[in-house]
Structure formats: structure tokens, C-alpha cells
From Swiss-Prot:
Pfam families: Aminotran_5. The modification N6-(pyridoxal phosphate)lysine is found at K206. The lineage of its organism: Bacteria, Pseudomonadati, Pseudomonadota, Gammaproteobacteria, Pseudomonadales. It is found in: Cytoplasm. It comes from Pseudomonas savastanoi pv. phaseolicola (strain 1448A / Race 6). This is Cysteine desulfurase IscS. The gene is iscS. The active site is at C328. Its EC number is 2.8.1.7. SUPFAM superfamilies: PLP-dependent transferases (SSF53383).
Amino acid sequence: MKLPIYLDYSATTPVDPRVAQKMIDCLTVEGNFGNPASRSHVFGWKAEEAVENARRQVADLVNADPREIVWTSGATESNNLAIKGVAHFYASKGKHLITSKVEHKAVLDTTRQLEREGFEVTYIEPGEDGLITPAMIEAALRDDTILVSIMHVNNEIGTINDIAAIGELTRSRGVLFHVDGAQSTGKVEIDLASLKVDLMSFSAHKTYGPKGIGALYVSRKPRVRLEATMHGGGHERGMRSGTLATHQIVGMGEAFRIAKEEMAAENVRIKALSDRFFKQVENLEELYVNGSLTARVPHNLNLSFNYVEGESLIMALKDLAVSSGSACTSASLEPSYVLRALGRNDELAHSSIRFTFGRFSTEEEIDYAAQKVCEAVTRLRTLSPLWDMFKDGVDISKIEWAAH
């Protein structure tokens, strides 16, 4: 077993070796290095063929038409293109959007920008299980609502929203529905032929593909129109200009092909690893699981260890790569906005650690990690006066701390 142990698969995943090999074949002079937009020679034709094959592979995983897949630089760009693209194109119909308080920053910062441009946005508060229900969305819908944007799987707590039910509601009201699917590909079945989803964002690097490449599903029936945010040579039917990165696109295609083939077996294995880890830590006192216990992916365990400061615990677990909150925002010392939205107090939000498991996690690593967590939590609590007071039966929430 090699240290440190990687338990941060929701931040990024290593590229599967099978994917890396396919990518290498598209880089050098011996390989498929041409520009897919070069129509006048075989180098361009071969590159275009590889790109279209990858488009089919991505579409196959989510049961879409390949013509509905638009290449982007990642899920952040896909979210921007979907939300801004719809808002700007349909602004004459209405200027109201709906999203939730627990979305990824790539959605929340995009809607904040639209607010500065004069759009109105309703931010739905989830239940304490972290889920967004159709009833919550129905209560927020207005006559001038043009778009609802709700994530499929939450990046911090791993909860799965019922996008099928939400889609039925939005379609019946004639409102477009965008789903951030960055964390769900390869973890949850996605069937866009039956889901009433108009736009869906995908990322390669959360699914054992390379960073810097993603895709946006744009429905053809019913047809969704977008205003482009990237202008240039008119690539991707004018929706996203820029020379296509053949090697990254081929990598994403291969990663999604593997995900389709191996997802069922992989989910069973990862559920067993997650259960194995939890069984070894669940007897720790004052341990809380963040998010729904049932509607969640097995890959994610977000735990709060009360009376232990999350950052101290991360430092104590120096052989484990884990995170507090999302990788994109964990540099700030603010408590996780996702956990605050669930109604967790500052102390519990600050004591949370996200453990995420993946394709290359082993039982040996899981056992070692669980043992280290138990040791570190127990040791840090012996150093905490608050823990002593709690053990003595003092209700810490009732204490009035005097300022000096």
C-alpha cells in the first residue's frame, strides 16, 4: 500500500490508463494529430472521425443523440453556456431563473452575474437531507420563469436529486430545465431519451478522463436555442467556437465508454468499500452523516465529527487526501455553504470532512484510513476543553461567552 492515500475522488479522478493510451495516440506526428476542422486532407478527416466517435461514446452513456452533444472545456463552461445562453436568448420571454443554494459555484456565480445584468433569480433552500424536491420548485415558479437549474448529484454531500420528477414539472409548465451532471456520470444511470431534461453539463475529469474537457447536452426535440458565449470559427454548430482538442475529446469518449461498461459492477464494489469504512468509524460519538442516507451515491461520505475542527483533523490525517467542502472553495476558511444550507450550525459545518472513494481505492486503504480517522478524532477530542464540558453534561449552546 502506497501513502498518501487518495480519498478525494469528487475533486478529481486519475485518468484511467486505457484513456491515457488513447490520448497519446492523438498527439505526435505518428498519431492522429490533425485539426478536425481541416476539410481538405486526410489528417483532418481522421481527426474529425475520432472526434465524432467520441461524441457517440459520450452520447451512449447518457442515451442521447450524438448531435445533441456540444464539446466545451469542462462542466464550468458547460454551466455558463447553458445558463447564460438560455437567459440571453429567451430574455424577451422572461427574466426569472430558479436554482438552489447548494449548487456548485459554477452555477451560483453564473446566476449572480445574470442578476447584475437585470435577471431575477430564486435560490431554493434544500431540506435538511440536502434534497431539492419538485414541490419546492413548483412553489418558486412564476409566469416569467424561463429556466430551472438543479444539480443531479451534489459534489460535497453526494445526494441525488430526483431530476426525472423535476423534469416532468418543468416540461408541463413550459420552462427549460438545466442539470449539472458533472458528479453523476458513471455513478447514476442517465437516460436523456426519457428524462425531461433540456440541457445537461458533463465533465471528463470526474469520470477518469482528462481535465480541461467537458460537454453540454442540448436537446433537439424539443429544440433548445442558446446564445453563444464563445465566438470564433463557428465550431460546434456555432454554439462553441474554438479548435477541438482531439486528444482530450478522445480521452473523454473513452472514459465515458468505460463508465458505461463498468458502472454497474463498479458501483457495487464502491458501495462495499464505503460501507466497510463507515462500519469502522460509526461508533465514534457525536458523528453525523451530512445529506440523505438513502438518496446518495455510495462514492461520497460527508461526515461531521462534532468538537473536532475540520482543518485540524485534515492536518492530523496527513497520510489521507481528503477535503473539507468542495475542492473549488476549500481554500477559504468559511464553513461550507452547502452544509449551512442544510441547517448545520457553524461548529458542525466546520467539523466536516468529505471522504470520496473511487475506481482505484482498495480495502487495505479503506481499513488504514478508518483506523487513522478513529485515532485522530479520539486524540483531538482529548485536547478539547469543549469535549470535556460536553462529556460532563454541559449544554454548550447555552453558554454565553463573554468578550474580553
